[in-house]
Every structure is written in structure tokens, then in C-alpha cells.
Regions:
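Non-catalytic interaction/Regulatory regions outside core domains
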Residues: 1-13, 18-112
Length: 112
């Protein structure tokens, strides 16, 4: 998790269990991560349900939510089904492409 927060513009990050919305690890501040984890669990579930309904048999690499002042990246873990990385970035200070790449690298290296 420390590696995620080192990303330029990163405010906070969490590892979330999408089966129950619980945070398994977190770092940083600026967002109520308990509330965000629960809400983003619903986002992940809704997208997966929609993909099944559409017959799409692919994986979600990441989900990007763009706000006026922030980026929120949700990255389901390919190697550990049911978990996702949640990263919040200050839009004015971050590089979205580099942050997405960092989330991908952390996902590959993260031991759960």
C-alpha cells in the first residue's frame, strides 16, 4: 500500500473485500475510506452484474471515476478474486496514466 501512496498526487488508498465492503488495508487521508469502500463495493458489484447480463466474459482492469478535483481508481485484483484496490488522487497534482500503471504494478506485487 505504501507504494500506491507514493504515486504523485495520491491522497489515500485501500485494499477492499468486495464480498462485504470491508477494508483489509489502508493508507493516507482526505476521504472517509470506510464509506468509500462500502460504496465502491456496490459499484464493482453493479458492473460485474451488468457484464454478466450482457454476456461479456472479460475482466475489469479498472474503473475510473472522474470528479471535479479528484480521480478515483478502482482496480479489481485478477489474482485474488473478490478484492480490489481503491486509489484516490488529487486531479491537479497527479498523472492519471502513471497512477493507473502504478495500481497495476502494485496489484501484481501485492501479497494477500
Amino acid at each position: 500500500m505504501q507504494e500506491l501512496i507514493s504515486c504523485e498526487g495520491a491522497m489515500c488508498a485501500a485494499l477492499v473485500d468486495s464480498s462485504n465492503g470491508m477494508i483489509l488495508g489502508q493508507i493516507g487521508s482526505g476521504v472517509d475510506l470506510e464509506v468509500a469502500a462500502a460504496g465502491n463495493t456496490e459499484v464493482v458489484r453493479a458492473k460485474m452484474k451488468t457484464m454478466r447480463a450482457l454476456g461479456i466474459s472479460d475482466i475489469i482492469e479498472d474503473i475510473l471515476i472522474t470528479l471535479g478535483k479528484q480521480y478515483h481508481i478502482i482496480r479489481p485484483m485478477a489474482r485474488k478474486e473478490g478484492l480490489f484496490i481503491y486509489l484516490v488522487l488529487d486531479k491537479a497534482k497527479s498523472n492519471l496514466a502513471l497512477a493507473r500503471r502504478k495500481a497495476q504494478e502494485v496489484e501484481k506485487d501485492l501479497m494477500v
